Amino acid sequence: MDKKLAVAMFGQKRLSREGGVEIVVKELCTRMARDGYEVTCFNRGGHHVSGAEYDQSVEYKGVRQKTVPTIDAKGLAAVSSSGFAALCSAFGRYDVVHIHAEGPAFFAWLPKLLGKRVVVTIHGIDWQREKWKSGFGSKYIRQGEKNAVKYADEVIVLSKGVQDYFKETYGRETHFIPNGVNRPQIREASLITDKFGLKKDSYILFLGRLVPEKGIRYLVEAFKNVKTDKKLVIAGGSSDTDSFMEELKDLAKGDDRILFTGFVQGAMLDELYSNAYI
């Protein structure tokens, strides 16, 4: 019988229904496990934004879960958990180590040093994000980017722009593999009507993390200058950028067509998708 390919993954907080990296890792891992691969996810310990339903599960849909030691403090949780995950994957019996995001890729050298094949998925040029503009965080993440270029056997990017960036900056060839999207369950407007007064085709939807690099302030400014009876629904959490959330709300003042829902999930999220005009 052929030996199953053993794959370790880290970089996510934990398997979770919400969160960009977390969704990608969960969908990728469960599909690989379904196809016969041995998949282990090294998850962060301590406080998390979501996914509590997976905390007590050693196995989830065929994916083995391991929680690594984590210094549960701002600025240290991601670094410490990634370091321990890299150590565990380097010394474990894995054929491939798949690292997600630039920060965790700082430790790509460790499994590579012990003979593992290393894949890094770049989910964005993280060191350029506003919350990492200066200090240790930006330098650490940028070094992670460089380590991905140097030590990874293969690098995956999610956009053509990032692919061009790696080619122009480092001369590094990458694989362009955009994220897939699960079709949401189609639902009639009910919860969103009761809570927000929204009906089918009555609103334009923005859904995502509320961070400056997504250009949301331009969306708000542009919408305020449009004559329409549609609402602008901005759905998502602030992701450690509460000051930017307040900036957006100040910018939207005086226009009651602009609605902030906060973090949404489950049936509420499906309804927002199903009934948006755009």
Label each region the model flagged.
Residues 87-90, 113, 136-155:
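Membrane-proximal helix-turn-helix segments that form the acceptor-binding/catalytic region
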Residues 53-55, 186-198:
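A short helix/loop element that forms part of the nucleotide-sugar donor recognition site in Leloir-type
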Residues 153, 274-278:
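Acidic donor-binding loop of glycosyltransferase active sites
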Residues 80, 117, 128-147, 187:
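Nucleotide-sugar donor phosphate/pyrophosphate-binding loop at the beta->alpha transition
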Residues 76-90, 94-123, 127:
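An aromatic- and histidine-rich active-site surface loop
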Residues 50-57, 231-257, 268:
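Short, structured helix-loop element that forms part of the nucleotide-activated donor/catalytic region
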Residues 161, 180:
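Carbohydrate-associated surface elements
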Residues 23, 202, 206, 211-225, ...:
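A conserved mid-protein helix/loop that constitutes part of the nucleotide-sugar donor-binding site
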